[in-house]
Amino acid sequence: MKKQTVSLLVLLLAASGFFFSCGNTVNKNAYALEFDSIQVNETVHLFGDTAKPACNLILNVAYASQSSDVRLKDSLNTFFLSACFGDKYMAMTPEEAVKKYTEKYVGDYRNDLEPMYKKDEEDKQDEQSIGAWYSYYKGIESHVQLCNTLILTYRIDYNEYTGGAHGIYMS
């Protein structure tokens, strides 16, 4: 009798599990994400003179533009902006962060190098070597390599040259 009761209980549990679970469909788009990117390619010359050295800033920053969960989108963008530009920019929108970062990079370049360049130009030893040391370049390119319900892979390629012999390259 006991064996029959256990078998009947197992059969009842299996049947009820089958009937009640059929109405529970999984929403495969629960965390649907769409990505976009913002691109900047800006070249700024010292003193605004195209004959003088320049800095070149190239940005291609991917960010979450749409999501079924706004909090997910916001937290991803916070992380992306922090990883690309630093913690100072993580509370901004992607558009605002790119604009502020571009302004700061160009402003710092001109403020830091124009006085030194002017002094070197007055001392003028070798025109070509002076120009090479004052030419700067920075590139930050990010993109989403993989995005599914379990994994998001975000890659950032960073390179920078600030005069001298070698630049910096990281991924």
For each of these PLM feature ranges, what is it?
Residues 170-171:
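Short helix-loop boundary/capping segments
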Residues 18-21:
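C-terminal motif of bacterial Sec signal peptides marking the signal peptidase cleavage site
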Residues 155-161:
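Generic short beta-strand segments
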Residues 1-9:
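Bacterial N-terminal signal peptides that target proteins for export
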Residues 23-26:
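Bacterial signal peptide processing site
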Residues 31-150:
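Active-site acidic/histidine clusters and adjacent loop/turn architecture
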Residues 145, 163-166:
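Short, solvent-exposed beta-strand/turn "edge" segments of beta-rich domains on protein surfaces
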